[in-house]
Regions:
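Intrinsically disordered, low-complexity, repeat-rich regions
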Residues: 1-112
Length: 112
């Protein structure tokens, strides 16, 4: 339980305000509401926490979590620094979850 809390604190310390600002923007992002952005930020942080705690498991993000992740990745320096802080190395994005057959779709469905 202690490791989960430490990981939650670590992931919680990642500064995501610039990403949230872009997600709310209708010009630079999808124009999400502030409420939706806060909710998806919470789920994104939970996703990162699960990936950190279970590195050998396939953890598949929802579409909204994946969108948040994409906007995080676009700030390449920040994303690399955040990955180093949380994972100790770069956390690669794999965009094909759920689209490579039944087993892949089952992994997607199992995660969320």
């Amino acid at each position: 339980m202690k490791d989960i809390r430490k990981t939650q604190e670590l992931v919680g310390s990642v500064y995501l305000e610039p990403i949230k600002f872009t997600l709310v923007s209708r010009e630079e992002g999808p124009g999400w509401t502030v409420e939706k952005t806060k909710l998806i930020e919470m789920w994104y942080r939970r996703f990162l926490t699960l990936v950190k705690i279970y590195p050998n498991q396939t953890i598949v993000p929802t579409k909204d979590i994946d969108t948040f992740w994409h906007y995080h990745i676009l700030d390449t320096r920040k994303y690399m620094d955040d990955c180093d802080k949380v994972f100790g190395s770069y956390f690669h994005h794999f965009p094909y979850f759920g689209s490579r057959g039944e087993e892949d779709k089952a992994n997607f469905d199992k995660t969320f």
